[in-house]
Amino acid sequence: MKYMTVTDLNNAGATVIGTIKGGEWFLGTPHKDILSKPGFYFLVSEFDGSCVSARFYVGNQRSKQGFSAVLSHIRQRRSQLARTIANNNMAYTVFYLPASKMKPLTTGFGKGQLALAFTRNHHSEYQTLEEMNRMLADNFKFVLQAY
């Protein structure tokens, strides 16, 4: 199994939304509309080279907190991963990828362009972000996450 890289994210169509350090925005805060989008957020540290350090997903929320809630959990050090990110004094570039663009990283992972075109999309009403998250864990390793 290989580590997910920035190249994998770029090939899937991910966009950089900013940089965090210690659970706070570093060098400017993105607009709330960007942070409240449902989908996947990936953290990449220069220290880890082009490998993705961690991943988080955000669903639809009435409060529209989105990735801001993830940052709050990091600042509060609510898990081992959050404590590591909060305490290691490293800057992380944050990439955003909507669920609609996850096919190359989940069901289409490792397939050529032709096979990818015929691979199913995630459109089932029962498809969950949790299921996509597990597919990512099946296909890739992440520097700071074991699963």
From Swiss-Prot:
Keyword DNA-binding: yes
GO biological processes: symbiont-mediated perturbation of host cell cycle progression; symbiont-mediated suppression of host DNA replication
An example Gene Ontology molecular-function term: DNA binding
Ranges in a coiled coil: none
Superkingdom of this protein's organism: Viruses
Pfam family, one: Phage_T4_Ndd
InterPro entries xref list: Phage_Ndd
Keyword Transferase: no
TM stretches of this protein: none
Entry keyword set: DNA-binding, Host-virus interaction, Inhibition of host DNA replication by virus, Modulation of host cell cycle by virus
Main function: Disorganizes the host nucleoid and inhibits replication, but without host DNA cleavage or degradation. Only the architecture of the nucleoid is affected. May act on the host chromosomal sequences that determine the structure of the nucleoid. Binds to dsDNA but not to ssDNA.
Protein's UniProt name: Nucleoid disruption protein
